[in-house]
């Protein structure tokens, strides 16, 4: 396999994700229509050169190097394809805010895998990219929907293979995501969780997840209300999110069917019917204002196509 010519460009768009949705800890996630865009260019130099230029929505520019997740993912592709590394530049337009529980790390991993693979004319199948993405991230709930799109349930089978189920999401159910101007790292959010939980809590979550998935499939309000409930991670994480429980209560009082921490937080996901969306969004923002936290709460539709790439220039 030959190294791509200098100047070849690939555009990759990767959706944000909301993980867990309450009871689906580390196994359930949904892609949302907020995207990061990556432009990969083959540049002069060897595999130890990787230039990452990031432009955020506020116009700020940041730079990153070989320690970045995008580059680490690209390296995994080269290793798996038995390909000699080559120099890459990645320009990123950031719309997914980092450390907010919206899968920003997953977008970096997925983009690095797809970009490096596509610029070499895709020697690795999508199944292999999924395997590499889960290996890098350590859990599947963000990277799988980020790559595939839609609502995805991922579990390791008795044969130790990853099994992915694309679940239905009824058109009548909409997502409002309250995104605060505060950050919370995944590592910090995981530190507060216990290593062991009562079996009764595990059983409760299994039942809740079943109710939630059936409610989302049928658009059944009551099943969603009863299923969007968690005892494995949220009881320990709410204390890390300033004003979070008040935001949840405000969303439910405004008509949300259910409310949960998005991923590791601090963003908060509310599921509702379209006619309640505006009231839910406003209530969540106002509740955070009372705690001294600025936020925004946009409607984010389910993104069903997953990550996409296109060739901008072949040389």
Swiss-Prot record:
Asked if the keyword Repressor belongs to this entry, the reply reads no
GO terms (molecular function) for this protein are: ATP binding; homoserine kinase activity
Q: What pathway, per the record?
A: Amino-acid biosynthesis; L-threonine biosynthesis; L-threonine from L-aspartate: step 4/5
* Subcellular localization(s) per the UniProt record: Cytoplasm
Source domain of life = Bacteria
EC numbers? 2.7.1.39
Q: Which GO terms describe its biological process?
A: threonine biosynthetic process
The principal location of this protein is cytoplasm
PANTHER family reported in the protein's UniProt record:
HOMOSERINE KINASE, HOMOSERINE/4-DIPHOSPHOCYTIDYL-2-C-METHYL-D-ERYTHRITOL KINASE
What family, per the record?
Belongs to the GHMP kinase family. Homoserine kinase subfamily.
Under what name is this protein listed? Homoserine kinase
């Amino acid at each position: 396999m030959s190294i791509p010519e200098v100047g070849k460009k690939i555009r990759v768009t990767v959706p944000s994700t909301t993980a867990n949705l309450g009871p689906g800890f580390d196994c359930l996630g949904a892609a949302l229509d907020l995207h990061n865009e990556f432009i990969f260019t083959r540049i002069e130099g060897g595999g130890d050169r990787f230039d990452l230029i990031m432009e955020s929505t506020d116009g700020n520019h940041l730079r990153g190097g070989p320690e970045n997740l995008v580059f680490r993912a690209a390296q995994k592709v080269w290793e798996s394809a038995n390909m000699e590394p080559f120099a890459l530049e990645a320009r990123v337009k950031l719309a997914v805010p980092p450390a907010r529980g919206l899968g920003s790390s997953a977008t970096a991993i997925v983009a690095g895998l797809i970009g490096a693979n596509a610029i070499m004319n895709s020697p690795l199948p999508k199944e292999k990219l999924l395997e590499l993405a889960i290996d890098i991230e350590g859990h599947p709930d963000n990277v799988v929907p980020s790559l595939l799109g839609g609502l995805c349930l991922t579990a390791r089978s008795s044969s130790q293979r990853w099994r992915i189920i694309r679940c239905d999401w009824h058109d009548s159910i909409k997502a409002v995501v309250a995104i605060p101007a505060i950050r919370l790292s995944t590592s910090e959010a995981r530190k507060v969780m216990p290593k062991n939980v009562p079996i009764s809590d595990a059983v409760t979550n299994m039942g809740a997840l079943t109710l939630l998935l059936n409610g989302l499939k049928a658009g059944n309000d009551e099943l969603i209300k009863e299923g969007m409930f968690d005892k494995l991670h949220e009881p320990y994480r709410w204390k890390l999110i300033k004003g979070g429980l008040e935001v949840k209560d405000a969303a439910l009082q405004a008509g949300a069917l259910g409310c949960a921490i998005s991923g590791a937080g601090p963003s908060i996901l509310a599921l509702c019917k379209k006619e309640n969306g505006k009231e839910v969004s406003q209530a969540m923002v106002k509740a955070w204002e009372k705690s001294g936290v600025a936020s925004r709460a946009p409607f984010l539709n389910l993104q069903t196509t997953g990550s996409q790439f296109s060739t901008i220039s072949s040389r």
